[in-house]
UniProtKB/Swiss-Prot annotation:
EC annotation from Swiss-Prot or TrEMBL: 4.2.1.41
Pfam families named in the record: DHDPS
This protein's name: Probable 5-dehydro-4-deoxyglucarate dehydratase
Pathway: Carbohydrate acid metabolism; D-glucarate degradation; 2,5-dioxopentanoate from D-glucarate: step 2/2
Catalytic activity reported: 5-dehydro-4-deoxy-D-glucarate + H(+) = 2,5-dioxopentanoate + CO2 + H2O
Alphabetic keyword roster: Lyase
Gene Ontology molecular function, alphabetical: 4-hydroxy-tetrahydrodipicolinate synthase activity; 5-dehydro-4-deoxyglucarate dehydratase activity
Enzyme class: lyase
UniProt xrefs under SMART domains: DHDPS
Residue ranges the record marks as coiled coil: none
Domain of life: Bacteria
GO annotation, biological process: D-glucarate catabolic process
Length: 303
């Protein structure tokens, strides 16, 4: 799949990022991961991101990363395209990127470089180096310390033909509008704020109709129903799902830092696809919070 073909796929439909399965000892559990991917693939996501932020990329050893990507690529070879999360320092990100390409990933999600604050030029040089290290398509994730502006994204688009997507995790509307207007159809644009459904209608109005869903991991039918309502501008259906599910969900998720990942793993367990515990420094939901989520999911009916 060439970068432009990937761009076309990412320009439509719902995207998601599977959690990574760990066993009771905290080691990667490929059997559980295969089962998860086989369950999720038929629901109709346009692409899946393996070892993304919700997939706990930040906690994976290099050898585990290879196992996760290979398992995802092999399992979904005939069902849904797999993009691999990559990140860390520039050299680390290049190593991950080249390994993901070798293993057959169709593209990359370039996660923010970890912790280090850097100038716009430095971040742009980081993105350019990763893009030029591979031939597959790359989506850059503007979030936290990675905050590229429209000027630099335009320059990167000229220098890196395989930079085909922009994912926004900042929620800066002025910046998002300036990037969307400046770059036009050069990129596919993805909404990437945590629990993106809450922002989906607003982002669609900005020209960003595609987003990645965390809750697809455990209520995939509900996630697809919500996306369909957004796509057809069914405001009543959107409002009902936000009131009935997403706002109560946020009340649980926002109780503690890091719960954006923890609550998804809890949901997967409730759904019958236990992915094991999160790795430190994240913490799992409390028993009370787990029961609150279970009751909320029950209201959504069979998936």
């Amino acid at each position: 799949m060439n970068p432009q073909e990937l761009k076309s796929i990412l320009s439509h439909g719902l995207l998601s990022f599977p959690v990574t399965d760990f066993n009771a000892q905290g080691d990667f559990n490929p059997a559980g991961y295969i089962k998860r991917l086989e369950w999720l693939a038929p629901y109709g996501a346009s692409a899946l991101f393996a070892a993304g932020g919700t997939g706990e990329f930040f906690s994976l050893a290099a050898s585990e990363y290879s196992q996760v990507i290979k398992t995802a690529v092999d399992t979904c070879a005939t069902s849904v395209p797999i993009l691999a999360g990559v990140g860390g320092s520039t050299r680390q990100a290049i190593e991950y990127a080249q390994e993901a390409e070798r293993l057959g990933a169709k593209g990359l999600l370039l996660l923010p470089h970890y912790l280090t604050e850097a100038s716009q030029d430095g971040v742009a040089a980081h993105v350019e180096a990763v893009c030029k290290s591979v031939n597959i398509g790359v989506v850059v994730y503007n979030r936290n310390v990675c905050r590229l502006n429209a000027d630099l994204l335009e320059k990167l688009a000229e220098r890196c033909p395989n930079l085909i997507g922009y994912k926004d995790g900042l929620g800066d509307i002025e910046l998002m509008v300036s990037i969307r207007r400046r770059l036009g159809e050069r990129f596919s644009y993805l909404g990437g704020l945590p629990t993106a459904e809450v922002y989906a209608a607003a982002y669609k109005a900005l020209g960003v109709p595609v987003y990645s869903s965390a809750v697809f991991n455990f209520v995939p039918k509900t996630a697809m129903d919500f996306y369909s309502a957004i796509a057809r501008d069914d405001h009543a259906a959107v409002a009902k799902l936000i009131d009935d599910f997403f706002l109560p969900y946020l009340d649980i998720r926002n109780r503690k830092a890091g719960y954006a990942v923890s609550i998804v793993k809890a949901g997967a367990k409730i759904a019958g696809y236990d992915a094991g515990p999160v790795r430190t420094p994240l913490t799992d939901l409390t028993a009370e919070e787990y029961e609150m989520l279970a009751a909320l999911m029950d209201k959504m009916g069979p998936q």
